[in-house]
């Protein structure tokens, strides 16, 4: 295990690992415990009471954070004709069809999110082996397979984030940067939690929000109380 620096160890002393804090207090601790020389990303991790192995308990989607993520997303749109023009007008960083597919197959990945119109998916699907492992494959559940390309691009640029439960029942989502005001981070946090509560599968039994924690890229995790959220 890598040796922790003095600043990190001092930061850890600020946090009671056994206590679950109120949202804003937890976020304040995350900000105080941020010791990196760059503007760290703040992330929320949620352990859900679901069985991801069951098809009716898969949780996946996307939501636009009210205060964005602090990161500029580079958007690639696969579209033709009028939809390609619409994507360009909306501010997509790259718009193409077969030309971009060929570039990706040769190792080009200068983008963060892909949007594709449904009629392009047969071709985009051929890139599944390279896009899938990187989490870049467009999906209707996250609004990235759509003919509404203008809305899709605008939402991504405004701070849309995707969420997906992993095999252990956890979801990790970025909610901003440590430089954000605590109130803005809290608003983004609550947007994520509210979205997850609404996405609770009917088949999920028992406690739904098992554990919630927030942390910065290089900082320690801080537990958040689940008491004020629907379980």
Curated annotation (Swiss-Prot):
This is Large ribosomal subunit protein uL1. GO terms for biological process: regulation of translation; translation. GO terms for cellular component: large ribosomal subunit. PROSITE patterns: RIBOSOMAL_L1 (PS01199). Pfam families: Ribosomal_L1. GO terms for molecular function: rRNA binding; structural constituent of ribosome; tRNA binding. Keywords: Repressor, Ribonucleoprotein, Ribosomal protein, RNA-binding, rRNA-binding, Translation regulation, tRNA-binding. Part of the 50S ribosomal subunit. Gene3D superfamilies: 3.30.190.20, 3.40.50.790. It comes from the Bacteria. InterPro entries: Ribosom_uL1_bac-type, Ribosomal_uL1, Ribosomal_uL1-like, Ribosomal_uL1/biogenesis, Ribosomal_uL1_3-a/b-sand, Ribosomal_uL1_CS. Disulfide bonds: none annotated. Belongs to the universal ribosomal protein uL1 family. The gene is rplA. Binds directly to 23S rRNA. The L1 stalk is quite mobile in the ribosome, and is involved in E site tRNA release.
């Amino acid at each position: 295990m890598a040796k922790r620096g003095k600043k990190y160890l001092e930061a850890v002393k600020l946090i009671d690992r056994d206590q679950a804090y109120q949202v804003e207090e937890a976020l304040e601790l995350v900000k105080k415990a941020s010791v990196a020389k760059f503007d760290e990303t703040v992330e929320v991790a949620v352990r859900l009471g679901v069985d991801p192995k069951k098809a009716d308990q898969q949780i996946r989607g996307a939501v636009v954070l009210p205060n964005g993520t602090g990161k500029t997303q580079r958007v690639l749109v696969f579209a033709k004709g009028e939809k390609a023009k619409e994507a360009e007008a909306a501010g997509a960083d790259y718009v193409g069809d077969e030309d971009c597919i060929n570039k990706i197959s040769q190792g080009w990945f200068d983008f963060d999110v892909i949007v594709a119109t449904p009629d392009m998916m047969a071709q985009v699907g051929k890139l599944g082996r390279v896009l899938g492992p990187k989490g870049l494959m467009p999906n209707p559940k996250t609004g990235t397979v759509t003919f509404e390309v203008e809305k899709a691009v605008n939402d991504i640029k405004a701070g849309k984030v995707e969420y997906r439960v992993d095999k252990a029942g956890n979801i990790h989502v970025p909610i901003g940067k440590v430089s954000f005001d605590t109130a803005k981070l809290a608003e983004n946090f609550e947007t994520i939690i509210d979205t997850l509560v609404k996405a609770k599968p009917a088949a999920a039994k028992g406690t739904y929000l098992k554990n919630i924690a927030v942390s910065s890229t290089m900082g320690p995790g801080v537990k958040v109380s689940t008491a004020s959220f629907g379980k």
